[in-house]
Amino acid sequence: MSNGIVIIGSGFAARQLVKNIRKQDACIPLTLIAADSMDEYNKPDLSHVISQRQRADDLTRQTAGEFAEQFNLHLFPHTWIMDIDAEAHVVKSQNNQWQYDKLVLATGASAFVPPVPGRELMLTLNSQQEYRACETQLRDARRVLIVGGGLIGSELAMDFCRAGKAVTLIDNAASILASLMPPEVSSRLQHRLTEMGVHLLLKSQLQGLEKTDSGILATLDRQRSIEVDAVIAATGLRPETALARRAGLTINRGVCVDSYLQTSNADIYALGDCTEINGQVLPFLQPIQLSAMVLAKNLLGNNTPLKLPAMLVKIKTPELPLHLAGETQRQDLRWQINTERQGMVARGVDDADQLRAFVVSEDRMKEAFGLLKTLPV
């Protein structure tokens, strides 16, 4: 009898894979094992929970039991996999073990917390579980410090501000979204955040946190300090690679996979935020959706390489939303920026005047799909 496919993880990547497998094969045994409850929720909603006044349980879209029944699955929630015996094709928890024919690691990524004194006082919002643990503190907080001015930090800063909280956003860089685009392109959103009342501390560094009788004292560089009620780390994600490393798989920034989503072991695959696909870490929904479609075919013997088109990344800042695509972080691009009252179109071109990247905002986001077609793949 076939041992089937074992998937470690229950997030967006794992669920997309299950749905794609079941479209092609209703009977192959599928086992999912994860450390959380395995209830389904939409992770991007975490950027808007405070202004929407949502509790953690409000985010649940489908319970684990409903998921198992709908897709004919064996589920093992609240279960930590401790070890993979790749030679024996076995995964092990503290009290159990499972045989597999093919194994998929969909272990996601964890929030990076800066290693400063008092780091244990920082909260993270990388999962429903993490939000559940701190939702009362965040709801009650009047003054919030967000560490990191990237995509998630900018989304959270706007959301907390819209909820009426006093928000400070700190980042080492000279502009927000610095790893995604140059300052002349992000300045429109930066100006909007400032207009809304977000206090931006750019080119600034958090040096430590300390609990006080009236809140949390954040010590900054240049002999500055501020007192707040909550501190959120939004300083990026780190792919979860510990289990893959223990299994002897090749690891770089993430679990290394090829165009077939195959790791350095022929019967182990990886998908989602934990992966590095041919040298690229792509923690966005669209590449995960496309990867899940391809991996489902490969697990069922229809070998198909992953080919990723130019893809949109959406920054969900409702007062000034942005869509971007292409190599927006390239230093050698020349930016042509057209700003009107209804929005901005910024085109990044190379020395040959070839469009390599673009950023569009507000009502001009409808121009994104036309621009997307002109980007080289």
UniProtKB/Swiss-Prot annotation:
Q: Where are the membrane-spanning stretches?
A: none
Q: What does this protein do?
A: One of at least two accessory proteins for anaerobic nitric oxide (NO) reductase. Reduces the rubredoxin moiety of NO reductase.
Q: Which InterPro entries match?
A: FAD-bd_OxRdtase, FAD/NAD-bd_sf, FAD/NAD-binding_dom, NO_rdtase_NorW, Rbx-bd
- Could you say which enzyme class this protein belongs to? oxidoreductase
Instruction: List the signal peptide residues.
Output: none
Q: What Gene Ontology terms describe what this protein does at the molecular function level? A: oxidoreductase activity, acting on iron-sulfur proteins as donors, NAD or NADP as acceptor
Keywords recorded for this protein, A-Z = Cytoplasm, FAD, Flavoprotein, NAD, Oxidoreductase
Q: What is this protein called?
A: Nitric oxide reductase FlRd-NAD(+) reductase
Q: Which family does it belong to?
A: Belongs to the FAD-dependent oxidoreductase family.
Q: Which GO terms describe its cellular component?
A: cytoplasm
Say where the protein is mainly found.
cytoplasm
Instruction: Give cofactor(s), names only.
Output: FAD
What does the record give as EC number? 1.18.1.-
Q: Where in the cell is it found?
A: Cytoplasm
Pathway note: Nitrogen metabolism; nitric oxide reduction
Catalytic activity reads: 2 reduced [nitric oxide reductase rubredoxin domain] + NAD(+) + H(+) = 2 oxidized [nitric oxide reductase rubredoxin domain] + NADH
Identify the gene encoding this protein: norW
